[in-house]
Amino acid sequence: MLSIDITDRQIKLVRGVHSGNKIRVQDADMRELTLGMVSNGYITDVPMVAAELNDIIKTKGITEKDAIVSITSSSIVYKEMLLPKPKSLKNTAAIEAMIQANMGVSKEFNISFTIAGETEDEEKNKLIKIIATACPQRLVDGYVRLFSHIGLSLKGVNIANNSVTRLIINTPKMADRMPMLLIQIDKGFLNMNLYEDNQIVFSRYFNIDPSDYDNAPDYVIRALSDNLFRMIQFIKSRKGAKPLKEIMFYGDTGNFIELSNAISSFNVPVHVLAAPSTVIS
């Protein structure tokens, strides 16, 4: 199986196989993309992106045809909500209909969700806690065209935020680190997710660009400092807010020391999110 992550600036491809209850990574590669080929997660130049992806596949001698893709875009809407508990939690159509009505999005959006728990209202009516994601269909359609162009079979579309949230809430030790801010670092964006009580309670996506920081080589670090300051002010303003216990990075964290030094004034412990134990190389 191939796992492909495409952002506005990069293609990342990982080739892995299931071995028992683990995933063994057999190969990985990355390519830089010319600006404009992908815009805010949308594939704007399918032939050019296909050529780059196909070159990776041919160079690595990859023969697998099944693939999943991870999508990140500010046009993807995230929302936490409480909904009446249906008679059967397997009735996903009913849950998706309630989510669609709650979020006020059209049928042109793909709805996905995670059930984060159950509760009751003041009248003892049973409710479910939902973390919902609405992804524009035309965003997905671009990846369908891309994979068709190079003969890959698209087996799944993962919203990056959902994937990492499932990892966080299914890792028991993570609950002890909350409230925790998880930050995805990328050359083109920052994605900040706040977790409390073993669930995601807020998510914010920031587009970043070198031109906003005089094309400085350390523009990502500057953008992190600026946006984290605003995020922490927002967190403090929330009713009943608790101080952060930890900040965790994932993504492009090769310059972790510089990243952590840039936010040391916030006096919150900083670490890199470790790969799950089920993934081996």
Tell what function each PLM region has.
Residues M1-S281:
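Hydrophobic/aromatic-enriched cytosolic interaction surfaces used to assemble or bind macromolecules
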